[in-house]
Amino acid sequence: PFLMTYGDGVCDVDMNKLVEFHKEHGKIATLTAVMLEQQKGVLDIGGDNAVKSFREKSHTDGAPINAGYMVLNPEIFDYIDGDDTVFEREPLEKLAKEGQLMSYMHKGFWQCMDTKREMDMLEKYLATGTAPWKKWD
């Protein structure tokens, strides 16, 4: 497996535990899920942590969302038709329908950087030395 993330968010997820969870469940893909009340991709997660459905960009009302940190097996490339494939649409939705997408629930720090306000907040964390995602010296 390999790790993939989007470039617009930070978090303090334990990558070793994420990879271990992925390997234990033997599915093609595992994404990190967080609880957030904003407009993001909504996950319908079953009792076994399998993702039952994946809907991008709707109002969440406190539902878990895709935090953008993933562990993927090479078979993921069979789900990508080409450069025009929207990863959050075809591949993730199809994997969920096939029972091949797992969710790893993260309860620590996570923040996207989709707006100037969010960027300013994250830069303030860095400037003051209080960035909760920074786990290195």
Q: Predicted regions span which residues?
A:
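Extended acidic/charged loop-beta regions that coordinate divalent cations
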Residues: I45-G46
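Catalytic-core segments of class I nucleotidyltransferases/pyrophosphorylases
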Residues: F2-L3, V10, N16-K23, L36-E37, ...
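A short, conserved acidic/glycine-rich loop-to-beta-strand motif
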Residues: H25-M35
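Small/polar loops that bind or transfer phosphate-bearing groups
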Residues: Y6-G7, L31
